Amino acid sequence: MSEMQGNKIVVDPITRIEGHLRIEVEVEGGKIKNAWSMSTLFRGLEMILKGRDPRDAQHFTQRACGVCTYVHALASVRAVDNCVGVKIPENATLMRNLTMGAQYMHDHLVHFYHLHALDWVNVANALNADPAKAARLANDLSPRKTTTESLKAVQAKVKALVESGQLGIFTNAYFLGGHPAYVLPAEVDLIATAHYLEALRVQVKAARAMAIFGAKNPHTQFTVVGGCTNYDSLRPERIAEFRKLYKEVREFIEQVYITDLLAVAGFYKNWAGIGKTSNFLTCGEFPTDEYDLNSRYTPQGVIWGNDLSKVDDFNPDLIEEHVKYSWYEGADAHHPYKGVTKPKWTEFHGEDRYSWMKAPRYKGEAFEVGPLASVLVAYAKKHEPTVKAVDLVLKTLGVGPEALFSTLGRTAARGIQCLTAAQEVEVWLDKLEANVKAGKDDLYTDWQYPTESQGVGFVNAPRGMLSHWIVQRGGKIENFQHVVPSTWNLGPRCAERKLSAVEQALIGTPIADPKRPVEILRTVHSYDPCIACGVHVIDPESNQVHKFRIL
């Protein structure tokens, strides 16, 4: 349902089970001129945690989502580790890193193939492909052998699905009936569709690898304040099991994911000029010392104004959360340690408030977090594995570094981050195995609560910088705030009316067909929002409102 009252547009959201997001945009002259990102779900986890034992935090926070899973547990545990001042054993850090590495591999594969691919790949067009020609192309792109027969089998599956009339997840796909924004040759569509199906099996292996150290997936239960508990995973046979699964997934990443990414991107190079933002922030990830952000394998840093010649150090003291345009009491910005979560529902745009998300700002400015931020900082800091991967992508596509600041660059960065993390997993695994063989099997350090203290845990999750902030007194949580990647990227305006990252990125995006705005989905999905989404397009020239589901 929607209505227009003067300049005020109200659109009911379309929601899904993993969360609720609505995007409103105004289109003028075939391009987006204004955008609003609206989260319509209130959870109030911070309120639930007050008065509880800090050790309980991870069990609540990671259940905010079954997709993000481990990252919230790790952020909570790191926050309490920091709060009590415990130094965890090296093996515990390695085990945490290995589980996070497996999460990166799983998360980015699922995103590219199963959450984002349909924005670029026309599955129906795969029926028009020549399987023999497609097989030759696949073999030219990758050292992995692809047969004509295997692609014929995929075509048969797609044909049977189409002829059944029961299209399942493809029912509302924008490519059905043809769409001018889909430009891949039929053979590339067929290859991508085949790998879409194969990735369903591969991602299970990554999830199983996570569960070897994490005890289960989703919602790991091996982290504790002071380290880890999964001593069983130190057995040689368990380490060998992880290594086998890891190698299978890494091979798929190197020989399939990256080649598919480059193949698809080559036909959409115009998207290197769409979806641009200006500021980027990352806390880095995969530490050797949990208390030193500079010890992390992928570096921390801040980039201003798309300037790769300079990277500032990240200063956590400069973070504030704004609520002037959110459904919370007050209008003042607060540092997370002083954060207040008191809901105040109005209506959409009532008192100018339009989202349950707060608006994080760093030094008063909106920042993008996520794979693109991480890759840009690492590239600017001459992080060797990242430089090698980025240069390969730029050379293959025939574009310069400026192309990274875009929807296409954001999607490519996710693959680059997946690749560089996967390559380093073997280093951590070898180190853990060597420690165990040398008789070094400690995973936990004992600790005590101070009378009162505060702490923060930073995790560079697959979707971007995540932080949990805790204040405890007498072993009970007095205040708890979490600042998640989606609030950085998909939050509302701040007190200074500065747009969030996705709101900025959508401005100027061309829309070929307002009734099927796949262009909006491409940019929104490039952030991998961990919430269900509804997209609405308002055309001020016709006063017509269109509702869409993100597929």
Swiss-Prot record:
Keywords: Metal-binding, Nickel, Oxidoreductase, Periplasm. Residues 537-551 form a propeptide. It catalyses: 2 Fe(III)-[cytochrome c3] + H2 = 2 Fe(II)-[cytochrome c3] + 2 H(+). GO terms for molecular function: cytochrome-c3 hydrogenase activity; ferredoxin hydrogenase activity; nickel cation binding. Its cofactor is Ni(2+). Heterodimer of a large and a small subunit. This is Periplasmic [NiFe] hydrogenase large subunit. The gene is hydB.
